[in-house]
């Protein structure tokens, strides 16, 4: 994901001063400059990824754990504390999404997110991929990453209920070790939700679809056109519709 963002950012034109500097360089100097920029880009990418992981773990796993621990003095049940931890985690997650959605740039990203969902829903419902059909399609989708993250939060409550050790350090270590397992179970649920369309699956998918009302916004026609171009660059949707008989 970071590599794709960096690649996208590379298409922004340099300012006039930068252009003049590069034009004045010899071929060897230009090559050395490009190598330097690549190294800086890799370092920036590594630092960003590392910070993102630490930030996410701190905000969504460690902070709820320590906040729920405050109630140990008044609540003796480990089960209730674990449930409280899960509720705090959900509240932080929803609050975080609500907060970042107030910024203009993120709101615009969410509009593109909505355009992406609309394009996929348009194809999966057997319609021609054009602006008019995409516009009237739903901006919510069962296989969305937002649904995945919410399911991770919910399933983690169940898994963490079974951590019954006294050491707080060991409790944190076990939580970290369970993250890949929780992510795997959540991924399989998302796949199941995308494959089947029955009442039980639809009910279980509702929380994720509700969250998508926050992480997707109605796109304008230009954004829809970008979404269509992106889909067509990735796969042959007409061939897919024929193969799937949709």
Give, region by region, the residue ranges found by the protein language model:
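Extended, hydrophilic extramembrane loops/domains of integral membrane proteins
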Residues: 1-17
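Hydrophobic alpha-helical transmembrane segments
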Residues: 83-87, 150, 173-177
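Membrane interface segments of multi-pass transport proteins and intramembrane proteases
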Residues: 30-37, 68-84, 163-173, 192-202, ...
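Alpha-helical transmembrane segments of polytopic integral membrane proteins
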Residues: 8, 60-64, 68, 93-103, ...
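Juxtamembrane "helix exit" motif at the C-terminal ends of alpha-helical transmembrane segments
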Residues: 11, 52-77, 152-174, 180-183, ...
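Hydrophobic alpha-helical segments characteristic of transmembrane helices
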Residues: 12, 19, 23-102
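Polar-ligand-bearing catalytic/cofactor-coordination segments
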Residues: 79, 83-90, 95-147, 192-196, ...
